[in-house]
Amino acid sequence: MAVMEFANVSFRYPTSKEQVLKEVSFQVQKGEFIVLCGASGSGKTTLLKHMIKSQIPIGIGSGSMYFAGADIETMDDRVAASQIAYVGQDPEHNMVTDYVWQELAFGLESLGMSVPQMRRRTAEMAEYFGLESLFRKRTAALSGGQKQLVQLAAAMVVQPKLLVLDEPTSQLDPMEAGRFLDTLAKLHEEFGVTIFLSEQRLDGVLPIADRVFVMEDGTVTDTTPRRVGHLLKERHDPVYAALPIAAKTALCCGESGDLPLTVREGKVWLRDYLKAHSEVSLETIVERITKMAPEISVSEYFGNADIEKPDIQR
């Protein structure tokens, strides 16, 4: 049985004639890591809100959403809150208490958990997320990255079956975003929680994702991390710019198969490509990349990949 299922879901807001979701259907299996991407205004946030009973927007809709076979709209509120956790874009807006320990305990208290159980759960989560030193600090004194980490810990403390995240790194700097995504990958690996993540920093999540859902004009296309680059390129989707450098390099060179996602994989791919295409020089590839994907820092990429011209062009 699927953890999450959408069956022909369509939706529009009361003040609009345009459908935000158009006959959306998909299934998410237990333990999967799903990445949702798409241009601004494609319907991502509205889609995610339909997964959270308390956040389903008011409007005109059709179709059904199911969690573990149960209709989300008619689920018991307590069950929905304990089984499906949500982390939003703005940690400032999502904070509901003054202190970190209160933030961690808030969801458990809402579910009626006993004080001893709450203490044990919050202590375990604080230790797991490395929040011991922040445990009694005011939430207002935390950095953006720390606040978002607290939000993630608060979501996980109820031990949900599904974790839904709406662009959680959008307000974080690159280093904080990297640490957050690393923590998310660790959670998925160690807890086996099903993750549905809307994210634009694709370079940090494609290597750990099982599938990628691409939204465009209210529709969803299901693809894989190693094939999504082809789809984005074909559609001239602005999200193409967020692909890992290794994937864009391969696309610029005409790769039609699975794409490399990490610098290490990119190094291997480029070495093999140059061996198979002796007529192509590294300078030609650099020129091609610069023309087709000017956002790539070519010198930084090849430096990180530790590729030296004499070695790969022999």
Name each model feature, range by range.
Residues 1-6, 11-23, 55-57, 76, ...:
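A short, flexible loop at the N-terminus of ABC-type nucleotide-binding domains that lies
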Residues 60-71, 313:
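Conserved ABC transporter NBD signature motif
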Residues 71-85:
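ABC ATPase NBD coupling module
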Residues 215, 219-260:
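Conserved beta-strand-loop-alpha-helix hinge in the C-terminal portion
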